[in-house]
Amino acid sequence: DDVELLDGAAAEFDLEKVRHGKLSPVFFGSALTNFGVEPFLEGFLRMTTPPLARMAGEAIIDSFDDDFSAFVFKIQANMNKAHRDRIAFMRVVSGRFDADREVYHVQGGKKLRLSRPQQLMAAEREIIEEAYAGDIIGVFDPGIFSIGDTLCAPGKKFQFDPIPTF
């Protein structure tokens, strides 16, 4: 009955507004009692976008482009308490990322070599050799990355539009 009240009181859900940062979905639940977990996961999957084109000013960077590009969406410190590390999470937008590849950090204005890229699942880490459009990877951050930073193939100089904030 309580859920019906929420459905009736809430405005119509609009996925496009979520994707453009104008609406933020709210889920209720408890992992301890397994209440609301399945609707959350189903909703998350429904709202998550596949690798899509992303705006970079007036240009559109298509996920099928051969040139590598990615954006930083999260930075997490102290994931490994023994090493006081800092990981920058990025989503590959286009092309292929290879370990030890040289990339251009647009905001920093310089080339970087990203070694030991990782895929993370909970507390587990796996060093990977390659990643493709749509993949999320973590790289060690010595303090040079910020949320929203653009990385791309050397010779390319574009900046992705900012990540929506609520």
Pin down the residues of each PLM region.
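Structural and coupling elements of P-loop NTPases
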Residues: 1-166
